Amino acid sequence: MKILGVDSSGLAASAAVLSGDTVVAVFTVNNKKTHSQTLLPMIKEVVDFSGIPLEELDAIAVAAGPGSFTGLRIGSSTVKGLGLVLDKPIIPVPTLEGLAYQLAESDGFICPIMDARRNQVYTGVYEMREGQMVEVMDQCAMDIHDLLKAVSYTHLTLPTNREV
């Protein structure tokens, strides 16, 4: 399956093309420009670099949140437009689950965190069971200090998308 993936949920924006389990091309931008300025040019570059034409894609995936409200709107509206024009299905991917999958080979619980501002983080707890990512604690926004008190440090990995 060939998929274009787009994430504009945080300060950085990313676009990637996957063919099966292989990341063919990836492009990440973390500069002062807004996602509305960078997302379409990034998508064009990553698709061109991958050598897989947009028409050959099987689906388009988009980070579905939590995250920056404006960034999520820009990403979802961009992907929705592409999906309509190309007649491709759209796959919403929970942002925290996407972060957790980066550590799918880890033992124990995975607790991704994203800065939600004002000493808050977006978080959830996941665990790999029989090759499947399982949500152990629902995604939520909470005080970073409450999270640190609540989690056990045994077999816990904390992937983040930036410093908190």
List where the protein language model places each region:
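DPxDG-like acidic metal-binding loop motif
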Residues: 61-92
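Residues at secondary-structure transition points
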Residues: 30-38, 69, 73, 77, ...
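Generic leucine side-chain signal with a strong bias for well-ordered alpha-helical environments
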Residues: 4, 39-40, 57, 72, ...
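Buried hydrophobic packing segments
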Residues: 43, 78-82, 99-103
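Short glycine-rich anion-binding loops that position phosphate/pyrophosphate groups of nucleotides
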Residues: 11, 65-66, 116-119
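Residue-level signal for well-ordered, solvent-exposed loop/turn and beta-edge residues enriched
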Residues: 22, 68, 131-132
